[in-house]
């Protein structure tokens, strides 16, 4: 099976932007400067601009945005801190860029269990600053102050990987929003269970 992609029609994009603006107000941005800022990471690849940048603040908002974009067949690009070297931020067909910088809370720290719960926009440096008082540290260091969401998406590693593993070994569970807008939860805080 061959998948073909094409740029959405101007009508579909305009209707989607209008819907997003109605729901998220000034957190829906279409200025050239903001779109250009969100069109590339640290890599050298050149690509097109997203049609709009939206700043969600909750998983439910992301679910609603993805549901809308899925129905209109509008591409979506997630944006953490823009440190990607791999071209993840390329808006080849325009679309909606989800800037997760407003989802940057450390929700829970369980020092006794050596774990914590964070939102996708939390950066590596922010997490380490927030848990430092417990004597813990987050060992993944890809060299940039990347977001936890971006590091998870790329299975980041770094200079400490030999001793502490990659992102894969340092995540117990995820809350994920699927392209059709469903919110699913994977994993548990339990390190070992009857399920493995």
Residue locations for each model-derived region?
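Short beta-strand
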Residues: 29-30, 78, 140
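Short, ordered loop/turn segments at secondary-structure junctions
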Residues: 80-83, 143
């Amino acid at each position: 099976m061959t998948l073909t992609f094409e740029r959405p029609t101007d009508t579909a994009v305009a209707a989607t932007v209008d819907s997003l603006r109605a729901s998220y107000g000034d957190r829906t941005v279409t200025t050239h400067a903001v779109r250009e800022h969100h069109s590339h990471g640290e890599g050298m690849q050149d690509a097109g601009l997203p049609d709009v940048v939206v700043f969600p603040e909750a998983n439910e908002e992301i679910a609603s945005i993805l549901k809308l974009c899925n129905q209109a067949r509008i591409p979506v690009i997630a944006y953490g801190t823009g440190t990607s070297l791999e071209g993840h931020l390329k808006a080849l067909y325009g679309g909606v860029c989800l800037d997760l910088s407003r989802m940057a809370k450390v929700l829970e720290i369980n020092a006794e269990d050596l774990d914590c719960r964070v939102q996708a926009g939390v950066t590596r440096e922010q997490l380490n600053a927030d848990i430092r008082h417990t004597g813990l540290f987050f060992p993944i260091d890809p060299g940039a102050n990347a977001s936890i969401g971006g590091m998870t998406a790329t299975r980041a590693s770094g200079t400490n990987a030999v001793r502490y593993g990659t992102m894969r070994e340092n995540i117990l569970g995820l809350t994920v929003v699927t392209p059709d807008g469903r919110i699913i939860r994977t994993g548990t805080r339990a390190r070992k269970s009857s399920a493995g």
